[in-house]
Curated annotation (Swiss-Prot):
Catalytic activity from the UniProt record: alpha-D-glucosamine 1-phosphate + acetyl-CoA = N-acetyl-alpha-D-glucosamine 1-phosphate + CoA + H(+); N-acetyl-alpha-D-glucosamine 1-phosphate + UTP + H(+) = UDP-N-acetyl-alpha-D-glucosamine + diphosphate
Segments for region (Pyrophosphorylase): 1-230
Main function: Catalyzes the last two sequential reactions in the de novo biosynthetic pathway for UDP-N-acetylglucosamine (UDP-GlcNAc). The C-terminal domain catalyzes the transfer of acetyl group from acetyl coenzyme A to glucosamine-1-phosphate (GlcN-1-P) to produce N-acetylglucosamine-1-phosphate (GlcNAc-1-P), which is converted into UDP-GlcNAc by the transfer of uridine 5-monophosphate (from uridine 5-triphosphate), a reaction catalyzed by the N-terminal domain.
Cofactor: Mg(2+)
Note accompanying the cofactor annotation: Binds 1 Mg(2+) ion per subunit.
Keyword Magnesium: yes
Subcellular location: Cytoplasm
Pathway assigned in UniProt: Nucleotide-sugar biosynthesis; UDP-N-acetyl-alpha-D-glucosamine biosynthesis; N-acetyl-alpha-D-glucosamine 1-phosphate from alpha-D-glucosamine 6-phosphate (route II): step 2/2; Nucleotide-sugar biosynthesis; UDP-N-acetyl-alpha-D-glucosamine biosynthesis; UDP-N-acetyl-alpha-D-glucosamine from N-acetyl-alpha-D-glucosamine 1-phosphate: step 1/1; Bacterial outer membrane biogenesis; LPS lipid A biosynthesis
Binding site for Mg(2+): D103, N228
GO molecular function: glucosamine-1-phosphate N-acetyltransferase activity; magnesium ion binding; UDP-N-acetylglucosamine diphosphorylase activity
GO cellular component, one term: cytoplasm
Name of the protein in its database record: Bifunctional protein GlmU
HAMAP family hit by this protein: GlmU
Length: 457
């Protein structure tokens, strides 16, 4: 098999996005557009990927580090000029080169593989990826002769009335013989209204040299959708989300209403898990088998075990074991580690907290910078007081501890195994194993005094 190379065009500023963020870095389902493109290319056994960068070059290189080499296009003088910037990396090499736009996040590896195969079968010097759409306005048209052989690409503004009725368009993705590409690029002129160097002119140069130019027509236009503004970004995200959600459903996940379920591309979900409408699963979240995630839940970069029930809760950068009940309205903040068979009830918040197996935090509890053992019961309104206004400190609770309602544990503090904290206590000192910790004022009943307070009518 001949060598394979790829050039990704990612130097355009993207002024129509009206954004401080560089265009190809706008995310589509949790990943920058250009990273979608490069990740698909990386599955094709490509020997070298060269990304042409311009505006925001450093940020693009950060996202694609280890996945691509980079060449900077200091002046944006057209697509042919952009590809020519890869001359030092690729010119003179035997093989084929894919040219793909970095703002086409829906392009799939299978389509590019089919393009490469077709290019090889036709023994072409260039093969254009084309598609057919109902309204081709604004796109370059593919002009073929009576035998179906590609003659040229005509831009919409230059097309005759007859040519404008052609519905086969240029998607902007190409496969070239590498040597022929760079030889032709040297002859591309900027003799046009915009004064730029255009890649479709390479097709004309090759045709004028009697080289074979082919066109591979793909079925779906959506893969070629270029994102140039926020409307197209929303459309690309919608199409990508549909693709992601359908893939999960094919693999045994129930999405009750896929149209209202947001799932990032790197999320993994086990079989027989049910995701209700209005759920957001972001980042590199992993969810095990037989889970239920109800409406209004958001899970970000977290690992969820099997048979977990998340009810209208938020989980961020945390780990949850098997057979755990969470919510409703619980908030697991980063670095929470919830072990098996734990109950995290309504209005419970954890942060940098380890919660041991079988422990119950039923309702209205805050546990921050805490290490909680096995089979602990923490009563309603209890708080691990971890911040003194300047520094954070840790609370350690042993196994089989009972913490009564409305208890404050003033960190740093340690409660030993099997200890009992009386309700309403403010614990400022360590409580030994098997001890009762009680720290509250003694109750004093003033007999008959209430009638002087005028609190009743």
């Amino acid at each position: 098999m001949s060598k394979r190379y790829a050039v990704v065009l990612a130097a355009g500023q993207g002024t129509r996005m009206k954004s401080k963020l560089y265009k190809v870095l706008h995310p589509v389902c949790g990943k920058p557009m250009v990273e979608h493109v490069v990740d698909q290319i990386s599955t094709l056994n490509v020997d070298k990927v060269v990304t042409i960068v311009g505006h925001g070059a450093e940020k693009v290189q950060e996202h694609l580090a280890g996945k691509s080499e980079f060449v900077k296009q200091d002046e944006q003088l057209g697509t042919a000029h952009a590809v020519l910037q890869a001359k030092a990396e690729l010119a003179g090499k035997d093989g084929v080169t894919l040219v793909v736009c970095g703002d086409t996040p829906l392009i799939e590896a299978s389509t590019m593989e089919a393009l490469l195969k077709y290019h090889h079968e036709k023994r072409a010097k260039a093969t254009i990826l084309t598609t057919v759409i109902e309204d081709p306005t604004g796109y370059g048209r593919i002009i073929r002769d009576d035998l179906g052989i590609v003659e040229k690409i005509v831009e919409h503004k230059d097309a005759t009335e007859k040519e404008q009725r052609i519905s086969e368009i240029n998607t902007g993705t190409y496969c070239f013989d590498n040597k022929a590409l760079f030889e032709a690029l040297e002859n591309v002129s900027n003799d046009n209204v915009q004064g730029e160097y255009y890649l479709p002119d390479v097709i004309k140069i090759l045709k004028d040299s009697d080289e074979v130019v082919a066109a591979y027509r793909m079925e779906s236009f959506e893969e070629s959708l270029g994102v140039n503004d926020r409307i197209a970004l929303a459309e690309a995200s919608k199409l990508m989300q549909r693709r992601i959600n359908e893939n999960h459903m094919r693999n045994g996940v129930t999405l009750v209403n896929p149209e209202s379920t947001y799932i990032d591309i790197d999320v993994k979900i086990g079989q027989d898990t049910v995701i209700e409408p209005g759920v957001m699963l972001r980042g590199k979240t992993v969810i095990g088998d037989d889970c239920v995630v109800t409406s209004g839940s958001e899970i970000v970069n977290s690992v969820i075990g099997e048979r977990v029930h998340v009810r209208t809760s938020s989980i961020f950068e945390s780990k949850v074991g098997d057979d755990v009940q969470i919510g409703p309205y619980a908030h697991l903040r980063p670095e929470s580690d919830i072990h098996d068979h734990v109950k995290i009830g309504n209005y419970v918040e954890t942060k940098k907290a380890v919660v041991g197996e079988g422990t119950k935090l039923p309702h209205f509890i805050y546990m921050g910078d805490a290490e909680i053992g096995k089979n602990v019961n923490v009563g309603c309104g209890s708080i691990a007081v971890n911040y003194d206004g300047k520094n954070k400190a840790k609370t350690i609770i042993g196994d089989n501890v009972f913490v009564g309602c409305n208890s404050n544990l003033i960190a740093p503090v340690k409660v030993g195994d099997r200890a009992f904290i009386a309700a309403g206590s403010t614990i400022t000192k360590d409580v030994p194993e098997d001890a009762l910790g009680i720290a509250r004022a003694k109750q004093d009943n003033k007999l008959g005094y209430a009638k002087h307070l005028n609190h009743s009518k």
